Amino acid sequence: GVISRIRREAFIRPWLKKGYSRRLANLYYKKVRADLQEDNGVSAADKKWAHSLGYLSDSIEKYDLKNTPGKYISDVDYMYLKPFNNSFTKWVGDLVTENRVLINHREHLPELYFNIIEREEKKVFLPIDTVDRKFGENYDDFIRLLDERGELVIRPDRTSANRCAYVIKRTGEDRYELKEDTACKARMSIFGNQYDAAYLLSDYPDDLPEDFEKNPCKREYYDKNSLYELISTFKYGYVIAEPYKISGEPCLLRIYAANEKLKETKLLDYYCTDLDGENVRCRAVTPSGELDGRKIGCWDEIIKTVTGIAGYISEIEYFTVSIMLTEGGFVIDSIDTNPDLPPIAHSDALNSFLLDRLEKKRETVVVTREKWWTAFKDKRFKRFVRRCCRPGIRPYMQKLWMSSVWDDFRHNKGTTLSQKLWCYKRGFLSFRIKQYGLTKDNYKSFLSDYQYHW
């Protein structure tokens, strides 16, 4: 309503004057509203005080703000620095691509066997090893490998908050069962996500949401065919991998790394996160690998591997590496190129790096009247695209299509206005009339520009 918009404008106006974008100010306003509604034991007065400095209320205890205000980078400034890095990071996060790119460190990556993708509405098993194909190249070969190994893991091809991994265990002749993947459950619990949200391992609760879709292929055990039917219901990409052999209680080591000027690698911060009962526990790790007075096993090898990976992908300026300790050493569980800050106070080295980066960005990002006018026109154009473009196409493709239409409308002088509108309505650019010889009778036999964009 009008009153809520007035409140929002009153809140974001001071932040706009400080040079933050409207998009960032609105995002911070949403976080502040959620923070005010959360009952975390912090008084409303302290919350408002922290918000005025650019921090959320959990940072008061985290950074001891009462005694050290302004020492650590604020939450709003960290949001201002995001997104980190550039287009070089597109491949990071995909397990299959990481397995191919980081070939010199494959012994510390998850061991993958098959990549499961969807083609023509069917799940297809492709070999990770496309050269020797020693584990096979189809679903039958996966079953053969499963019978040989006894158990394998089916996991999302990238870390997900909604999708989880399962252990597929052979329990008899042509009999397989889904089991809990300890590593995935620990990972998702640490980040506050629900494991087995599809309830494939447990009974459905009584308070299921109305829009919840029950999996029709759920069973207590599966044969070869029913297992394939179950896997076919999984959305997006999955991989078949070797289960982690976790040593003791699962924990997640996270190391913050930075590459300066494509040549110097710095490890900035280290911490360990695990579960203490149902509570998430986070502890700092020293640069020498000491945790609660004891040195972490394989620490020197961990540092060597992380430094080697960071140097190999030196185009990526700032990222974190998540590591799980196993019986045989360790495995690099994931790489995050847009990480959040640690849940505990971060190190001085990481803080100095972020503050220096913040100062450089403020020097280079200058909001001029021309930039403001360009942003205003882009916003108006996006609104026009949403209203005029047909649904069923991704927003960035809508923008490409409408940009093509606008360019054709302005520069193609060989067609009349009515011909242009006729073409646009049917998904063609107007110059196709002469190129294809378009008529009302034959235009459906050609692939339209709109369909090509889609």
Language-model features and meaning:
Residues 254-256, 320-324:
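Short, surface-exposed charged micro-motifs
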Residues 147-152, 157-158, 163-285:
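Phosphate-binding site of ATP-dependent enzymes
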Residues 3-147, 159-160, 384, 388-454:
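Conserved N-proximal alpha/beta basic substrate-recognition cap immediately N-terminal to
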Residues 98, 138-141, 226, 240, ...:
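Short, hydrophobic/aromatic alpha-helical segments in well-folded domains
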Residues 71, 76-78, 86, 216-239, ...:
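Alpha-helix-centered segments that form part of catalytic cores
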Residues 288-318, 325-417, 421-428, 432, ...:
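C-terminal active-site "lid" helix and adjoining low-complexity regulatory extension at the edge
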Residues 91, 108-114, 152-156, 167, ...:
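A structural signal for short, well-ordered beta-strand segments and their strand-loop junctions
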